[in-house]
A protein has these predicted regions:
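C-terminal catalytic/substrate-binding lobe primarily of soluble NAD(P)-dependent oxidoreductases
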Residues: 1-154
């Protein structure tokens, strides 16, 4: 399995410029006799990300591409979810990145509170039965899809 994220060239260029001009620094610097932290200054002058959802277009795409051997045969498996920024905004007033972050966190909390995910000790969410979580994803607006034995470009 492999985790990856992709971004448009314009977005990557902006990130590179921010880094190259030192605005991603987290150490304090002196500016006009004031100590400031560049990344905190940048946050103060940029628009609040929560206010940008109305103009987002396109979709998020979150998935796992898996390749391995099963029953002595090479197999591929792709499980994924696409989420429309526009649909997420209409439902919540937030864009798809916020939606795909918040909904899974809510589901995890719900399963814990309901006692579905509860064991003595300390556990990571990945150690619990995934089936109730996957069922809830479908019911809470993040339906997932599966593709088998396709070219995954791995």
């Amino acid at each position: 399995a492999r985790f990856w994220m992709t971004f448009g060239q314009e977005y990557l260029t902006h990130l590179r410029v921010i880094q190259n001009i030192g605005m991603s620094r987290i150490d304090p610097i002196m500016y006009n006799g004031q100590e400031i932290v560049p990344i905190q200054f940048l946050k103060a002058v940029l628009p609040n990300p929560g206010d940008l959802g109305e103009n987002y277009t396109g979709e998020t795409s979150i998935g796992c591409r898996i390749r391995g051997i099963k029953d002595d045969k090479e197999m591929t498996y792709y499980i994924y979810n696409n989420c429309s920024h526009h649909a997420a905004y209409l439902e919540t007033g937030a864009q798809g990145v916020s939606y795909t972050t918040g909904v899974p966190a809510m589901i995890g909390a719900k399963l814990f509170i309901q006692g579905v995910w509860k064991k003595p000790g300390v556990w990571n969410v990945e150690e619990f039965d995934p089936d109730p979580f996957m069922k809830e994803l479908n019911e809470q607006g993040l339906p997932w899809h599966e593709l088998f034995n396709i070219d995954l470009e791995l």
